[in-house]
Amino acid sequence: MVNQKRFLDNFILVEYNNLSYPEGYTAQIQEVAAHFDKDVIDPQRAYSMHTEYSYGKRKYNTELISKYPALIAASKNGVPQLWKSAEWASEFADFIVDLVSGHSVPTIIEIHPPFNDYCSLAGFVDRFRIFENKIHEAYPDVIIVIENRAGSVYHGGRFLVGKAKEIVALCDLIKSEALNLGVVLDFPQLLTAENIDPLKFKTEKYQSAIQTIAEHRDLIKGIHIWGKKKSATGRWVAHAGNFDTYFGGND
């Protein structure tokens, strides 16, 4: 059994959606939503910007987003197509700087991968450089990280970085191209991408995925661990419940 105190002592804790940690632990960083339908943020302390993640449709109806035609145009049935072009990458950086204006500089900016029906890893790297140059010109010390993704209402492709082998391919490029980019490893999304059923958990398959990524542990700057539970209709609800509901009470 993992010693909870010793486990949590290894991390800088991030507050998600005003949820609290066990007694004796306080989050040092606040996660702030920064998707394309946001036109204002309200950080209360050091914060991590959780930028557009392309799960579902956006309205694109704020005064702020109206300034960025490339961001609006890069949409399929309302779902944002991240990293669609060089112009998109440039406007994405400007959007973030605009959103931050009047507030303290973020500690972390968390980005997300494109879909694979219009962008390759090489294309992402080229567009990320444009974004990174503008962001670090504005905020030299900000940490930029990318999260592995799985799950979206998008049709036509899937996220470019979701499975363990795709995370490794990205890490290889980060190193070979000397990108100023870290990785946030989202464990539940990794399970989804690898088709690991939490109610019929296959330890060997999970360990294989983790061992594949382990060689790049130096690039892993953070992790996401969260619960799930099933709704009344039997649909999984993310960021809800706990590990008991997620794994069916199995050890």
Regions found by a protein language model. Name each.
Residues 1-10, 42, 75, 90-107, ...:
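Histidine-acidic metal/acid-base catalytic patches
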Residues 1-90, 94:
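N-terminal pre-domain/capping segments
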Residues 3, 20-23, 81, 117, ...:
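N-terminal start-of-chain detector that recognizes signal peptides
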Residues 14-19, 33-35, 50-56, 114-116, ...:
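Active-site beta-loop-alpha junctions enriched in small/polar residues
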Residues 27-34, 48, 110, 145, ...:
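Conserved beta-strand positions in the central sheet of alpha/beta enzyme cores
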Residues 37, 172-174, 211-213:
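Short, flexible, glycine/charge-rich loop motifs used to bind or transfer phosphoryl groups or to couple energy/partner
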Residues 58-66, 121, 154-162, 194-204, ...:
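Short, flexible/disordered intra-domain loops and linkers
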